[in-house]
Amino acid sequence: MMASRMKRKFHVRFRAGENLEITSKDYLSLYLYRNYGAIAKDYYGYHVSVIDLRNPLFSDGNNMLHLVNKYMDFYKQGRHNLSLKAKTEKYAKIIAKTIIFSDGESASNYGQNSFFYDSAEGLLTSVILIISEFCPARQRHIVSVFKLVQDLLKPSKIKGKSSFQVMMDLLPDNHKAKWFAGSALNTGEQAMMSVLSTILSRLNAFIDSEIEQILCFETAVDIEKFCAEKSAIFLVMPEEDNTKHFLISLFIQQYYREMLAYADEQGGRLKNKVIMYLDEIGTIPAIQSAEMIFSASRSRNISIVAIIQSLAQLEKNYGKEGASIIMDNCQDTLFGGFAPNSETAKVMSENLGYKTVLSGSVSKGKNDPSQSLQMIQRPLMTTDELKSMPKGNFILMKTGKNPMKTKLRLYKKWGIELSGEYKMRMRNHREVEYASMYEIESILKSKNQNIDNIMQHIDFQSIKRGGVKVE
């Protein structure tokens, strides 16, 4: 579906007040966010965020740790509120799972190595919580997580202990960051180093001086704001640079998991409908549990519009069975504009079904003319008929309805005029600050020293005389 076909639908969505998440390759994104970002913001009151991986200096920010930091700050203001602490841990676990299993696999698929991936997920959760709790605001981002994990691989000054073990010893015994790292902490040194190396291999893809301008600062529209208010997020994918494609897949996974977490707080269903337009979903790296996403999203008031060029793209990413599950969970299928050698046209012809037609033959002889008629079955539209449909003609298949042949007109023929562009201003290059293991250790030692000083000034004998049991 090209940009001109999507424009009319976006106007309807804007009027309905539905939230939109749109990912597209570069040339299509120029039409979408430049034209429809302005319309959404100026005429319908939408919050608009553009995550442009092609031009990071013209992009809004998207700090993956934003919600963790947000609830960590709230929790620090009132430590008695355990629900805030639970939210911090929940969003940290979402980020860790998304990064460790970003290739679409699950721990069970790694066989004997599943321990390392499960441990890596727990340890990454732990490091995220430590960064969020003990680092200054400008250092709380995903690249700091990489930097800290790298520092933890260094040998420590204490004989027989790694830097990782030394830092964990400085945390209180009941600190959840220490618990999340438990499986890695209580294993052999070689296995521990393997777990840390597994995390580094996953985080290595974030090391990019330009992309840091997106990942290391503020977030324009977080998922809670996105779900609660009218919002549109545009993800721009540079088709010529496949090293950044994984970020699109990663953002989609994180957004979806955070939307589910938010929906659970709202009774299991989002109050505002969310539409995810995923252009080129067949060319970005596989989205973990995509089959489940397509199966379960509708019950959470989330609709997914998957836009592909060929069914073979889905099969390549998700396998034949996974592609079949995704297709089976699509209530509407719109297709047209097939290439002359398209195999997808053959599949779509079969999906349309068959009709019964009258067929026969007539033969004439001198004395015995004969006529033969019979009812036969033929495809509703053959592969050749689908391939030869005029430009702008499409077939719509909808659950519970007969297939429909329709013409989708250009947006101009609907009377839609695009008056202005949504322009992103160029941001100045900002210096990125990173977390330091030594600074975090210094903070932890200072906190422990303060606790020791307080304990020394408590008169336990007076407390005992007051009838309070002290252990």
What are these regions (language model features)?
Residues 1-2, 6:
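Methionine residue identity
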Residues 8-10:
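Cationic, low-complexity basic patches in intrinsically disordered or flexible, solvent-exposed regions
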Residues 20-22:
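Intrinsically disordered, low-complexity segments enriched in serine/threonine/proline/glycine
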Residues 24, 28-302, 317-320, 384-405, ...:
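P-loop NTPase motor domains
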Residues 294-395:
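Conserved ATP-driven motor cores of ASCE-family P-loop NTPases powering translocation/secretion/packaging/pilus
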Residues 409:
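Short, surface-exposed polybasic-aromatic patches that bind anionic ligands, especially phosphate groups
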